[in-house]
Design a protein with these regions (language model features):
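N-terminal small-domain helix-loop-helix segment of the aminotransferase-like
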Residues: 1-69, 77
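Short glycine-rich anion-binding loops that position phosphate/pyrophosphate groups of nucleotides
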Residues: 11, 72, 96, 143-147
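Glycine/Thr-rich phosphate-binding loops of Rossmann-like dinucleotide-binding domains
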Residues: 14-16, 75-76, 99-100, 148-149
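Conserved PLP-anchoring active-site segment centered on the Schiff-base-forming lysine
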Residues: 81-103
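A short helix-loop-beta submotif of the ANL/AMP-binding
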Residues: 104-111
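Active-site phosphate-binding strand-loop segment of PLP-dependent enzymes
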Residues: 111, 115-168
Length: 168
């Protein structure tokens, strides 16, 4: 009981009933068909409304929003769109097991950055400086981090953001 599993994301609780009830309701209504590959139109529209309200950003839900089944699929699709053969991708470690293979499948070169427990597994500007090259194109910044649960605060992220802007 005192062991915390750091394995693949299996919750240690049952799915709440309000979620189960909605699934049952949806099945009873006959909504058992595939959605569009880009995601439900209504969800894409709601995402654009949220982005407008929260961040004053405007996107076309029909052409600029893609709903994936999870974060890993989204990262995979983004890497395949951005990488050219030989481009390097910085991946802080430990990290979710799929990031490195996604880079390899997109013809990129994964470069791992071993995060330090003394920094609570938070990425630092110094660690970026030690790993960036002229081939670096992408930084995977997966926080909150799986499997450590590490979270980067705004104060942690600001120097990283400055570094990224400096190295475009």
């Amino acid at each position: 009981d005192d062991v915390i599993s750091l394995g693949v994301g299996e919750p240690d609780f049952d799915t709440p009933w309000h979620i189960r009830d909605e699934g049952i309701y949806t099945l009873e209504k006959g909504r058992t068909f595939y959605t569009s590959n880009s995601g439900l139109k209504e969800l894409r529209e709601e995402i654009t409304h949220y982005l407008k309200r929260r961040f004053e950003l405007e996107y076309d839900p029909m052409h600029e929003v893609l709903v994936t089944v999870g974060g890993s699929e989204g990262i995979d699709v983004a890497l395949r769109a951005m990488l050219d053969p030989g481009d390097e991708v910085l991946i802080p470690q430990p990290a979710y097991v799929s990031y490195l293979p996604c880079v390899v499948l997109a013809d990129g070169g994964p470069v791992t950055i071993e995060l330090q427990e003394k920094n609570q597994f938070r990425l630092t500007k110094e660690e970026l400086l030690a790993h960036i090259t002229d081939k670096t194109k992408v930084l995977v910044l997966p926080f909150p981090n799986n499997p450590t649960g590490s979270i980067m605060t705004k104060a942690d992220l600001e120097p990283v953001a400055e570094f990224i802007k400096e190295h475009d």
